[in-house]
Design a protein with these regions (language model features):
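Soluble or luminal CAZymes and related metallo-dependent hydrolases
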Residues: 88-92, 122, 176, 214, ...
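Conserved alpha-helical substructure of the radical SAM core
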Residues: 10-17, 21-141, 148-149, 308
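Short, flexible loop/turn elements at secondary-structure junctions
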Residues: 68, 116, 145, 169-171, ...
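N-terminal amphipathic/basic-hydrophobic helices that include classical n-h-c signal peptides
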Residues: 1-6
Length: 311
């Protein structure tokens, strides 16, 4: 990691001569390179970010449904807490995406998820619309491998160049994983598998007692890269997004960005998004989470909440 980090710094010094390595945004950029999230091919994008007031969102979760086929106890998205899950209409999702793209210049990776995205009956329409957006570099669908797409229109959409699938392999719970891999191979759909045999628990949603300095340290160690976009609002993470919708996490208006109902002009909103993404030091939701702390413990993978069991 350190060797790669130094290489990244050297590459940035050569390619971004007018930016100091101490720049706080650049420090996060170096971490992203070193962590393998970006390659050298993205150097021009980072030049634009740092030198040309160019707003890039590296990764953002695009939530199309809160309905899921599993009830994982330690779900980071809090899906088991939704008693009345929603599947958003194509019209709303198009409007939501258009609004976001008014303010950002580039989305490196749009992560389509839920819930379980293959549950959405009109996923092909959502993908066909998103793939036409030049500001979106790639689209990744995250599935738990329990639902096999059978709609010919959807399969045709999945074949498009920008689109790929990542299967979160939950062992025996991902009952359609092998069939999905075979379908992707047969139809030349890009597909990969992400297997994490040991999960970690973010803990319950009760408030912890932590000082501002402790929260800053927790936030630094959490080091979340991917933001979450739910119902027209940009949140720092999926736990905050779902928790806020459920009313279990009370986020202030400064702790998310409501791009669907903003009252400022485009430049004001762009500046706020940039400030939110790079200058946030912690959010209130951190008080209701153990990630980034010693309290974050390993737990069994994809343990299911039993029917009727209270969370």
């Amino acid at each position: 990691m350190s060797a790669k980090r130094n290489l990244c710094k050297d590459l940035i010094r050569v390619n971004l001569p007018d930016v100091k390595i101490k720049n706080k945004i650049l420090r996060r950029t170096v971490k992203a390179f070193a962590g393998g999230i970006y390659g050298v091919s993205h150097i021009s994008s980072f030049y634009n970010i740092l030198c040309k007031d160019y707003l890039v969102m590296p990764q953002i979760d695009f939530v199309i449904t809160t309905r899921c086929s599993l009830r994982c106890r330690e779900c980071a998205n809090l899906m088991p807490y939704f008693k009345e899950p929603e599947t958003y209409s194509v019209e709303f999702l198009k409007e939501e995406l258009d609004k976001l793209l008014e303010y950002v210049d580039e989305i490196h990776e749009l992560r389509v998820l839920g819930g379980e995205p293959f549950i959405h009956p009109h996923l092909n329409e959502i993908l066909d619309y998103a793939v036409t957006k030049k500001k979106i570099n790639r689209i990744v669908i995250f599935t738990n491998g329990t639902v096999l797409p059978k709609n010919d229109l959807l399969i045709e959409s999945l074949r498009k160049k920008k689109i790929s699938i990542t299967i979160s392999d939950y062992g025996t719970w991902s009952k359609e994983k092998d069939n999905l891999l075979e379908l992707c191979k047969k139809n030349k759909i890009k597909c990969g598998v992400n297997f994490i045999p040991q999960w970690v628990s973010f803990g319950g949603l009760q408030k912890r007692k932590r000082t501002a300095e402790e929260l800053k340290e927790q936030f630094r160690k959490c080091d979340n890269v991917c933001k979450s976009y739910l119902e027209g609002k940009i949140y720092w993470c999926e736990r905050q997004a779902s928790g806020n919708k459920l009313g279990l996490i009370k986020s202030t208006e400064k702790e998310y960005i409501d791009v669907m109902n903003n009252t400022g002009n485009i430049e004001q909103v762009r500046k706020r998004i940039l400030d939110y993404c790079y200058n946030t030091r912690y959010i209130g939701a951190c008080m209701q989470c153990d990630k980034g702390t010693d309290a974050c413990k390993e737990v069994p993978m994809a343990e299911q909440v039993k029917k009727g069991e209270l969370l």
